[in-house]
Structures are given as structure tokens and as C-alpha cells.
């Protein structure tokens, strides 16, 4: 807020500008129109369009209107014709009282640009009031010794009309003693005087009754009468005389009721009743509304009503002093009303625009006029508004002010302003008037919708039902009304191969997203697209957000056993030497699961066995191993059923059936892996050297016992028949892979070749790591051979 010392220069500048405007406008001659009082409502007064040199259409475009001094609605501008017409009957006496001429000041306001044309309407008087006397009967006491030509003042009649329609003449009923003389005061008003023509004789006629008639100058003339009772008294030598013929006093307008204005004093040289004086008020310039009261005994004049300098600035009174003998004297009292700062400044709003668009700088919000009924310094004013609003005042002509915006407003920051207009006069003490106006700011579409998040991640479990609600996006708009109404849409995907319109849809009103079809995690794990939010303003504004949909895997795939194959053909038979140690690797069940995550975590367990406790299955890798030492009492042929189960909910499973044959003195040649195995090709070089060395030693040993082993194998016919395995033609399904990261194919194994009867194709199966058993087997065979 600015310090007071900084604001006073601005206020002085505004005051100086107003004074300059007043001086400038004083040279303009206002247009004057006239109309008779009591003219009917709607009567033609003037053609303002022609007088202003404007077209009728231009008056409407510029918002022409008529503003009067006291905001009276007596005049109206017809924008269709450009004519100034009466909006109501005008009563001159009510508008101006005795003031002549009766002039109504008004202005014609035009906007875009702002122009003010001053004009006056003269309301002429018609003779619509008759003269009226203040009393129904007047009583005069006249001594019989009064000389001829003696003048006796009479109370005048009052007529609300002015000019020639006021009282012009007085006459009295025919009689032999008196006639009436009509006198004219300085203000032009007429008053009667009774003049004695012949001597009076109390003994002949003690009283007379006459009729006084007041006649105005109207056409036709109007009149009023009063009865005069004249009482003839005995001789009275001296008439009362006032100390002063003229009393001049000044009274502040804020004097309280009952205050003493002045005391008049008269004296009479007679004694007794002839010297007793009484005072009376027999003429006032404002008899319609007299604010004074005269004491008949003391001559004190006191206020009985509040004075108002702005209504009447002076009063003229005639005081009569009468003695008991019927003689009288008179004096005049001139009362000047002194102006005090007793009127608060006034503000009248001519136009107010609310709401106003938020993006409209230098926009006129209000046009108003200020005035102070006081005079001099008491009537000078300063107009201001508070500092914390983006508005300013621009002085115009004829005490008009324009309230305009300083710059563009922002409805989203503030949608309503309460502006207090303060008017302070320069009187002592200073009087202040405040008036508040409310200005609403209308919305302009200057804010785009904003999503609550720049990106959304939605999770959908596969195998969902079509039309499933998968999530929502939300955007808000800081504007209001239709500018804040948001509609949602799917934007074209950046990936041209993504069938977005067949995957999801969006509710344009609330941003709800729906899946249009059942999603398959194995076919589509995730996809993303953009959504748009557009408001309904003009022009429309929009924004966009990214939506990422992640398809959650469901346990909809059972484990698939890769080895041993479960295709209904002759199963492979695994050969296990009876000399195998506990933990001997018989084979490995290899399985995969098309799901992911824990749905693809596989576990193995031995479901059935010919001889429980002989074999065991490792739960995590599917390796089938011997659980104890084999003996000759164990049956040679075993059937194992291995259960492969995933970790889904609910879990899915598959089974693998194995044939295991226990043999005596069985060994297997080493066969190198195919060159195509990428994992073996990348084995550690040290391991390769060790394997080569071990293979060389084994080869030398095998060569020494080759004939012996071959003879033993040939003797066992069943060994030849069960050594075959059947493998289906064609590769394994390519999509069956282990996705667990620790699947059953994570280790490297050697393979052996099985030749099936009647076929020249080579098949494979896992080669059991027999090297640790060769030494023990060879030792046993050597002992047998030596025996």
C-alpha cells in the first residue's frame, strides 16, 4: 500500500484536472429545451439524434443515455427514434418551488468513445394554483382618530405559481371608508395595503366587515378571498416603532432547532393598553415552508426547522408590532444562511459492466458521477479506490469518472473483485462517502486441460472378459462453464502395427478405459498409447498423457515335458548299473512352462515308483537319482512317474513316465556332443583339457577290456532290445522355452546315440555321468576276470 504522502500528489492532480475540465466546459453553451409542466408522459421534447449530429443507429451502438442532476427519471431517450421524451409528468412547483426560471440540467452520455453533452430543460409554469391567504379572517384595530390616507398593511395571499400566474392585484369589497392599494416588493411579489379614505366614527359604526380578493394574472385568472374585520377604537396617540427598520443576521445551516435567530424590539410612548406591544409575522418570502417562529410577546425569532443552505440560502421576513390601541409598526428581517460542510459527497453510477472478460485490458467497468451539494471548498472532492485491485480511475467530464482495468485479469486467480470507491470533500471537517461495487470476471478459454498424471500404468490380468474396466484417466481444466468441460479420446498410436482400436476404448465423458477383447500375455505382454483431453471452449484447447498397459500373466499353461518325450510311443529306457552308488544320476526330466514368473517356476516330485525308496527326484531340477545302493534282490525293471508342477494359483501339472532297467557290468562309451551345441563350444578351456585327458586314459583302459565287455553284452539279449529309444521326427516346439532363469536346461549334459532297429537315423538321449563308476566297475570286473 502506498504511503499517504505519495497518494496526495495523485489526488491533487485529479483535483486540478477536474477544475480544468470545469473551466473548459464552462465555455460550452448547453442546449436548452423547454416543456410546460403537467405535460403528458411520453410527449416529445426534442430530437437529440439531429441535435447531436448522429444517426439513430449510432446512438444505440454507443449506448446513449440521459442522466439528470438528481438521478430523476423525468426524461427518456428513445434509441429507436433518437427522440427525447417525457418519462413522467413534471410539476414545476415540486421541482423548483418559487425559483424562476425552473431549469432541469441533464447530460447525454455516449460511449466508445466517452462523450458528454450538456443540456437544459426549461419547465414553464401553467396557472394551476389559485391564490390563498394564510388565514380565513384578518382583524384590524383602527383608532377613530386616524387621519385620512393612513396605510394599514394586510397579509398577502400566496400563490405557488410564478411570474404572471402569481398574484397580480388585490381589490376589496365596496365600502365608504377604505380602498386597497397593491404594492410590489423588491422580489417582484405583490402585497396589499388598506388605505383610509374617510374618517371613522366609533359611535356611528364600531366595526366593519370587508372582503379582500387576490387575483393572479393567469388565463383564465384565478382568485382567493379573505374576510377583514375592522374594529374602530378610541383615540391612540402613538404607534409602535422598531429600534431598527432592518435586521440582518447570518445563521449557520447546521444550527439546531430552537436556536435564537434574532430578537426584534419595538417601543410605544403610550401607556396602558395603548402601550402594550405584540409582534406578528405577516410576510415571509418562503411562506410555503417557514422555518421560523416569532414570539408575540418578546419578539424573539427562533428556528423550528433545520435550515439547508443548498435548498434556500436566504430568507426575508416582515415583522409587525401592534399596540393595544390598534396602531402598528413594521420592520424587515434578512436572514442569510451560512453554508457548512454538512453534505456528504454523492455518487451515482450511470453504467456498470459485470462480468467482464478476463483477457480484456483497459476495459471500462463502470461510469459514475460524483457531486457535493455544499459550496466552495466544501463542495470540492477527491475520488479514489483501494490500491490492491487491478483497476484505476480515469476522470472524464462534468465530474464523471471511468473505472477501467489496468491490465488483463485472470479469473482462475480471482473471479470476483469488491471495489470500494471513496469520495472525500475538502471541507472542515472532511466528509467521506464510500460505495462498493462487485465486479465479476467472466471466463475465457485460456487454460488447457491438465491430466492428473503425465503417464498412467494400468495392470490387466490376461484372459480378461471383454468390456472390462481396466482403469481411468482424469484431467481438470481451471476454466469454468463449457470451457472446463473435458472430453477424452484415444490418439493414433505411434506404432502403426498396434491394433489400438480393437484393444481398448475410452469413455469420452469420464475417461474410463475398457479392454475390448481378452488379452493373452503370451501374445502381448505390454503396450502403450496416448489419450487426449479436449475442452469445449472456443478455440478448443487440449493436452495428452501416456497410458502404459501391462498384461499380468495368469497360470493358463501347464508344464510341458521336453524329455523324456510323452508321445505315446515306446518310452526310452534308462540303463542303470547295479554297481551305481547312491546319488547316481539316472536321468533328468526336462520341462518348460509357457507362463512367466512364479507361474513358470517348476517343481518335481516322484509320484509313483515300482519300488519306493530306490529312486528319488530332485524337486528343483528334475534329476532322477538313486537313493541307495542297488542289490541283486532289486527287480531289474522299474517304472517311475514324475509329477511336474508349476507354482501358479491354482497350480497346473504334468506327468512324465520313465522306464529304468538295472543291468550288471554296464558301461557307456563317450560320445562327443555335436558341434552345434553353443554352450559346450563356450566351455572353459581348462575343463576341456581335463576332459580330453580323462577321455584318453579311459580309452586306453576301455581298449584293454573291450573284448570282454562285448562278449558280456552279446549274451544279454534283453539288453539289446531295451537299448532302443523312440524319438519323434521333427523338432521340438520352438515356443516352449524355460523362462524361469533357473530352469531345467541351465546345465550342460552329454548325449549318447541310440540306434533303433530298422532305422538309420540317429536319436539322442541324455548321457549319464558314468566316469566316477568306471573305476569301481572295472575293479570288480578285474577281480572277476582274475578269478
From Swiss-Prot:
Source superkingdom = Eukaryota
Q: Where in the cell is it found?
A: Cell membrane
Which residue intervals are topologically Cytoplasmic?
A: 712-787
Per its UniProt record, what SMART domains does this chain match? Answer: CA
UniProt-annotated glycosylation sites, renumbered to this chain: 418, 567
Q: Which residues cross the membrane?
A: 691-711
PANTHER family, per database record: CADHERIN-87A (PTHR24028), PROTOCADHERIN BETA-15 (PTHR24028:SF97)
- The name of this protein is Protocadherin beta-15
Native organism is: Homo sapiens (Human)
Where is the organism placed in the taxonomic lineage, from the top? Eukaryota, Metazoa, Chordata, Craniata, Vertebrata
